[in-house]
């Protein structure tokens, strides 16, 4: 029997710090209840995907100063539509059908939140965005 909904929910990490409240907007509730757990679950894949992206773009990312690396991450996600769509696919593919339906009702605002969270997550883990380190954190 295919129980995709419960299987997806079961494998997601619990994030206690970010709760949902009645006075939150629908987007903020979706961000805390769905996006943050999915991003945490997909974190190793997001890191590996960015490292692969940087390598395929001549590897300059690894040789530039930290402030420029931060800008590079933001620029790559905002300006490279193909890369951004790949990241969105990694995240949306972990939605339940109910979450996907909610997402489609307000995808523009939720995409913006999603990409801002991905940028922050990659920037916060800058020390892991090195091919040798990443292969050991798997």
Model regions: which residues?
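Long, highly charged low-complexity segments enriched in Glu/Asp and Lys/Arg with interspersed Ser/Thr
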Residues: 106-138
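Short, well-structured hydrophobic secondary-structure segments
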Residues: 32-62
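N-terminal leader/targeting peptides and immediately adjacent processing regions
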Residues: 1-37
């Amino acid at each position: 029997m295919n129980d995709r909904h419960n299987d997806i929910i079961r494998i997601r990490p619990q994030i206690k710090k970010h709760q949902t409240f009645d006075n939150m907007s629908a987007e903020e509730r979706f961000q805390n209840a769905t996006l943050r757990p999915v991003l945490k679950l997909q974190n190793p894949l997001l890191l590996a995907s960015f490292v692969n992206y940087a390598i395929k773009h001549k590897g300059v990312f690894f040789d530039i100063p930290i402030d420029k690396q931060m800008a590079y991450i933001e620029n790559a996600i905002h300006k490279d539509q193909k890369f951004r769509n790949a990241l969105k696919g990694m995240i949306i593919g972990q939605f339940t059908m109910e979450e996907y339906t909610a997402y489609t009702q307000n995808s523009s605002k939720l995409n913006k939140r999603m990409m801002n969270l991905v940028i922050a997550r990659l920037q916060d883990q800058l020390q892991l965005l090195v091919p040798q380190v990443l292969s050991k954190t798997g």
